[in-house]
Amino acid sequence: MKLLISLFFVLSTLTALSDHQTNMESYKAMMITGGCCHDYKQQKNIISEGISERVPTKWDIFFEMDQEKSKAKLSESGWADGYDYIVYNHCFAHEKDASFVKSITDVHKVGKPAIALHCAMHSYHWSIAAEEGKKKAWTEMLGASSKGHGPKAAITVNKVRQHANHPIMKDIPEGWLTPEGELYNVQEVYEGTTVLAYGDNGEDKNPKEPQACVWVNTHGKGRIFATTLGHHNSTMSTMEYLDMLGNAVTWVMAKN
């Protein structure tokens, strides 16, 4: 009898979870991934499957390691049409074509939500000079500028107190320690950007000061979520990281 009751409870729970996902709005997303220095072949699956388990999403994944081929894809007219949101998990730091980069950011300025992960913060701005009196297009969209990073070391993620219950951070425990990490240097956080968490890789590491590692921004009409966390597959695969991404999708889509 006890076995039957336990089995009934398990089946009821699974049915409730299934019904919850069925009733959730389903999205269509594109992921732009590839480039230098990361295991993008595996990460594209970790990210897409992890998000889909939390927020029903149908995916088109553009995986290209060559910078010029990736640029050609994103230069096509209407490449983002038909997608509810775009995920950038790529690393093309040495793009020099400012007009190309602006064409991407314009997609989001008119309202397309975006999720930017790890080396997306180093992409599209290192080799482009800012026009006098203006910010670089890519970093303006992200809401912050980053160049360089510390050594491979676990990162303690400390939530900003006043935003500890932000919808994106609500499932992240205070002081979460990533399995591995590579703490990015964030030289400037722009006005209008809301930092949700700072990362600390220890007193004997560099950078010496905690760095912004999770934030949100609004670029024109488009909501942007960005995190510098995620160099290693071990970090991206954690429940905490994937919960954060699922929450981020819900947040960037809420305005729409």
Which stretches of residues belong to each language-model region?
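Proline-centered loop/turn at the N-terminus of a beta-strand
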Residues: 113-115, 194, 223
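Sec-dependent N-terminal signal peptides
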Residues: 3-12
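Helical hinge/lid and interdomain linker segments adjacent to catalytic or ligand-binding clefts
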Residues: 28-32, 39-123
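Boundary at the C-terminal end of the N-terminal hydrophobic targeting segment
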Residues: 16-18
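Active-site rim elements
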Residues: 34-37, 152-156, 173, 203, ...
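A glycine-rich, often tryptophan-bearing local segment used as a flexible ligand/cofactor-contacting loop or short
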Residues: 93-171
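Extracellular ligand-binding/catalytic regions of CAZymes and related secreted enzymes
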Residues: 22-27, 42, 53, 57, ...
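Catalytic beta-strand/loop cores that center a nucleophilic Ser/Cys/Thr
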Residues: 52, 58-60, 71, 144, ...
